[in-house]
Amino acid sequence: MSRYRGPKLRITRRLGDLPGLTQKKSKKTTRPGQHGKNLGEGKKKTTEYGIRLEEKQKLKFNYGISENQLYHYIKEARRRNGVTGLILLQLLEMRLDTICFSLGYAPTIAAARQLVNHGHIIVNDKVIDIPSFQCQIGDVIGIKSKSPAKKIIENNLKTINFSAPPAHLTFNKEKLEGVVQNYCDRSELLLDLNELLVIEYYSRR
């Protein structure tokens, strides 16, 4: 299944705020659809399956990943020792495109993915053009020398609501470099999500 490329505010009206998808807020007060409920009237889906599906969709749309990619991360999280839900989130947060977003290089994860795809981002002084690249503790993320995207990134850092990166990252404003200090803590996540419901959604696969 390919990534969603349709109206972003339509998705946030249905699922709530998704900081990785868009920073914009919809002025409409109803959910999408001809007979959409007001946003304050509760969720449209009331079955247990529907609630789990909605949480899964939040994860997919926020990080801009396909169904196959998400299932791959689920399997990898199950394989590792620890709390599966937290490991899943840490895998997604350690993606290079997510880290570029968290450092303030871009206003959305999709925009950060473009920076990576076009070869503007370096990890430990090497150009990495794979958005799903899994960063490791100690990795240094920066901008390629003489990259035309540097001015865009500098402008993004000034214009988007970026004050400081999450605690597992440090950022050098002079060098425009970030360092991965640790795995993310659950409390740092901006996304309103119940990851346990996502794990339950895939429990029979």
From Swiss-Prot:
Pfam families: Ribosomal_S4, S4. One of its GO terms (cellular component) is small ribosomal subunit. One of the primary rRNA binding proteins, it binds directly to 16S rRNA where it nucleates assembly of the body of the 30S subunit. With S5 and S12 plays an important role in translational accuracy. Its main location: plastid. Residues 94-158 form the S4 RNA-binding domain. Belongs to the universal ribosomal protein uS4 family. It is found in: Plastid, Chloroplast. Keywords: Chloroplast, Plastid, Ribonucleoprotein, Ribosomal protein, RNA-binding, rRNA-binding. InterPro entries: Ribosomal_uS4, Ribosomal_uS4_bac-type, Ribosomal_uS4_CS, Ribosomal_uS4_N, S4_RNA-bd, S4_RNA-bd_sf. The keyword Plastid applies. Part of the 30S ribosomal subunit. Contacts protein S5. The interaction surface between S4 and S5 is involved in control of translational fidelity. PANTHER family: 30S 40S RIBOSOMAL PROTEIN (PTHR11831), SMALL RIBOSOMAL SUBUNIT PROTEIN US4M (PTHR11831:SF4). GO terms for molecular function: rRNA binding; structural constituent of ribosome. It comes from Thalassiosira pseudonana. GO terms for biological process: ribosomal small subunit biogenesis; translation. This is Small ribosomal subunit protein uS4c. Gene3D superfamilies: Ribosomal Protein S4 Delta 41, Chain A, domain 1, RNA-binding S4 domain. Residues 15-44 are annotated as: Disordered. NCBIfam families: PRK05327.1, rpsD_bact. The keyword Ion transport does not apply.
